[in-house]
A protein has these predicted regions:
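Solvent-exposed beta-hairpin/edge-strand motifs
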Residues: 102-158, 263-266, 597-610, 622
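Surface-exposed beta-strand/loop patches in extracellular or lumenal glycoproteins
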Residues: 93-131, 244-248, 253-263, 536, ...
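A surface-exposed beta-strand-loop module
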Residues: 29-34, 85, 95, 101, ...
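Beta-strand-rich binding/interaction modules
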Residues: 269-270, 282, 334, 571-653
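Hydrophobic alpha-helical and helix-loop surface patches within well-folded domains
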Residues: 24, 38-51, 55, 70, ...
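Glycine/proline-rich low-complexity spacer/linker segments in large multi-domain proteins
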Residues: 117-130, 196-256, 277, 655-691
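Hydrophobic helix-coil surface modules that form long, contiguous segments used
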Residues: 227-238, 244-418, 446-447
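Early extracytoplasmic/domain-onset interaction patches
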Residues: 27-108, 504
């Protein structure tokens, strides 16, 4: 989904809260009781069931009995551009790879978000014209017709109806088909459906991940009845979470064979590879496209001079565009008679060049001027960071929603192409449950966007300060923990899904090192490629990859809203030993990291086993987080560098651990007038670290 400003999401109500914070900071330390540090990872019933079944385990890798549903779609759809109506037929072959028989089938009907009874999240935009939702007019399972009349409500004393035909019951954005005979484990079934819906018009704002501008441009997504995920985690198997328009999706992987019938003269961008270019593109357009992979230049393939049937496309009334996508979790498309087409390439390490296409309105050429280079850099950089881009093409399409991702296609303005391209890794390649755990795709993506931006600028990633900034909001009563269902995260959904994960990963870098974090996440990405990792798989995988027991870390960051709130309480010197009393008033522990700044001249600085000399007069000294596991809130750090004068000591000098008041991290304390100055902020809205 669209890139969100970390500044807007992290610096919330700081000025309004200042008086209360000042009182809290002035309170006696005795107000904070000794703390018991929780060091295990809480396990819910669903993950315990998966462990017991052997589908997942504490290695963090897919278990020996891991399985997932597989869905193959064959879809034919027609767009009535004047009416804005899409009519379709689908045939879905579903492979049940589980040990469980299916007594029901659950379908996703996400277009009902726009229907009269759609339950929409509070932050869903109101620029959308409501429709009648999706109208399913025919449905069969293995050739047996499904009765589309909702079943009568049960009345006490009335015997249940005999299951002569499968029954169909719609609950807003999902439908349950109750089967008269269970579908066998390790078997397959075929579902066929006919449906139609009106694409919602968008005026004066943005769409909810799709929409139409007038009757000349359509972004089409969440547009076909989709078989819901059936996995090893839920009791009963099926994902029945409602689509509310804020949190996103959870999809099966499978194969898509899709034919789209649109007016001649309209260009189509879609998930997958176009199978019939000779039938839908004019010879001159195909000839220009034949040079796409020859260089990094952006080629102008279709210009306004090519608008209309018989120019960019063959003449006639209508054309059918045929796309095929292997191993994808969804299919989306966009079409317009006003699109121009630019083309370039990205060179993927180990794979070679892949085509990158951009379909946009001529009036938006300034916004799209850098779309090609941005998308190229994103695909190449993230391929090296995590793993090679998994798909054969990427298409960016203009339209009412300027920041939404689908496999191989992005509804995006040029400025968001780096962020949206990152989603081709999560969740398009690692199929996480975005509806529940938005941080596993949006949050990870925000983190990698920080790295990508720095790479484009030939700078070091500005991760210092990111982790520390969480202390400014931690404990807010409106903040849901990251493990809380993102569908119901409330007013701080954006913070929970987008902002907190990069803070967490910055903090983890402060514990184990940024390069170690990125190496472990690359290994995690390879292990779960085209599978469905859960948060527990991620946590256990990272523990094993980093050779650390990080239960204390995961608990504080994911299951709670804790902060470190560390400080230097006292410094005293006797002989050649300086004792620094460090205090942590928050519930989250951290390693004790001190930057010790010496006078430029004086007696020799003696080495310490847990210290590294940064330069001739600065040492970085670290004690592991274990020093807090006994429950104390204070730790006496012994500095045994000899008799060289120490001029300054800073706790958490790289600003990685959540802290509300950073001024008490420094000894001696900053001057009062300096402390009153507002903190500088970097590009991502984070305080500039001055450690």
């Amino acid at each position: 989904m669209r890139l969100r400003s970390l500044q807007a999401l992290t610096i919330l109500s700081v000025s309004a809260a200042a008086p209360a914070l000042a009182v809290a900071q002035a309170a006696s330390h005795s107000a904070y009781p000794e703390r018991a540090v929780r060091r295990d990872i809480p396990m819910t019933d669903m993950i315990r069931r998966a462990f017991a079944a052997g589908t997942r385990d504490s290695s963090g890798r897919p278990g020996p009995h891991y399985w997932q549903l597989w869905t193959d779609y064959t879809i034919s759809a027609r767009l009535d551009a004047a009416a804005g109506v899409v009519t379709g037929h689908e045939r879905v072959v579903v492979q049940n790879n589980s040990d469980s028989a299916m007594r029901v089938i659950v379908l996703r009907l996400d277009q009902n978000l726009f229907g009269p009874s759609g339950a929409r999240a509070s932050d869903a935009p109101d620029a959308i014209h409501l429709t009648d939702g999706i109208q399913v007019t025919g449905l069969t399972v293995d050739g047996q017709a499904v009765n589309l009349t909702p079943p009568p409500r049960f009345r006490f004393g009335q015997p249940p109806a005999a299951p002569a035909l499968a029954a169909y019951n719609v609950k807003t954005t999902s439908a349950t088909i109750t089967l008269p005979t269970p579908l066998s484990a390790h078997g397959s079934f075929t579902l066929e459906a006919d449906w139609h819906f009106t694409v919602p018009k968008v005026e004066g704002g943005r769409g909810i991940r799709m929409g139409a501008w007038g009757d000349t441009l359509y972004q089409v997504a969440q547009w076909y009845p989709r078989v819901a995920v059936f996995d090893d985690l839920r009791e009963g198997g099926w994902d029945t979470e409602e689509y509310l328009g804020s949190a996103e999706f959870y999809n099966n992987f499978g194969h898509f064979d899709v034919r789209l019938d649109v007016p001649a003269g309209w260009l189509v961008g879609a998930t997958g590879i176009l199978q019939n270019p000779a039938e839908v593109l004019a010879p001159a357009v195909r000839e220009r496209l034949s040079h796409q992979l020859e260089s990094d230049s952006v080629l102008h393939i279709v210009t306004p001079d090519d608008f209309g049937p018989g120019k960019a496309t063959p003449a006639g009334d209508r054309l059918v565009w045929h796309f095929v996508a292997d191993t994808a979790g969804d299919f989306a498309w966009a079409t317009s008679d006003r699109y121009v087409l630019d083309a370039t390439r990205a060179t993927i390490p180990g794979r070679g060049p892949v085509p990158v296409d951009m379909l946009y309105l001529p009036g938006h050429a300034p916004q799209y001027a850098q779309a090609g280079p941005l998308a190229r850099h994103a695909l190449e950089f993230y391929s090296g960071l995590w793993m090679p881009y998994a798909f054969p093409r990427l298409t960016l399409v203009d339209g009412p929603d300027t920041g939404m991702e689908y496999p191989m296609i992005i509804f995006s303005a040029a400025g968001a192409s780096d962020h949206e391209a990152g989603h081709e890794w999560w969740p398009m390649t690692l199929g996480t449950n975005e509806t529940w755990y938005g941080w596993m795709d949006e949050g990870f993506n925000q983190y990698m966007n920080i790295l990508s931006y720095a790479d484009r600028q030939h700078q070091s990633p500005p991760l210092d300060g990111v982790g520390q900034a969480y202390g400014r909001i931690s404990g807010d009563e409106q903040e849901a923990p990251m493990m809380w269902d993102a569908n119901y995260a409330g007013p701080l959904y954006g913070f929970q899904a987008y902002s907190k994960a990069p803070m967490m990963l910055s903090s983890l870098g402060g514990v184990v090192g940024d390069s170690a974090v990125q190496r472990a996440m690359s290994e995690y990405a390879h292990a779960w490629r085209f599978k469905h990792p859960s948060p527990w798989d991620y946590m256990f995988f990272m523990d094993n990859a980093l050779h650390r027991d990080l239960g204390w870390f995961w608990y504080s960051w994911l299951f709670a809203t804790d902060a470190v709130n560390g400080s230097i309480q006292d410094v005293r010197t006797a002989g050649g030993t300086t004792t620094v009393t460090v205090r942590e008033d928050g519930q989250m522990p951290s390693p004790v990291v001190l930057a010790v700044h010496f006078a430029p001249t004086g007696p020799r600085i003696r080495p310490m086993a847990n210290a590294t000399m940064v330069d001739d007069s600065t040492a970085l000294v670290t004690w592991p987080v274990d020093v807090w596991f006994g429950g104390s809130r204070t730790f006496d750090a012994k500095l045994q560098f000899g008799r060289r004068k120490i001029e300054r000591i800073v706790f958490d000098p790289h600003c990685r651990f959540p802290d509300r008041n950073v001024d008490d991290n420094t000894w001696p304390r900053p001057a009062a007038q300096a402390a009153a100055q507002p903190q500088q902020q970097g590009r991502f809205g984070m305080p500039v670290c001055k450690g």
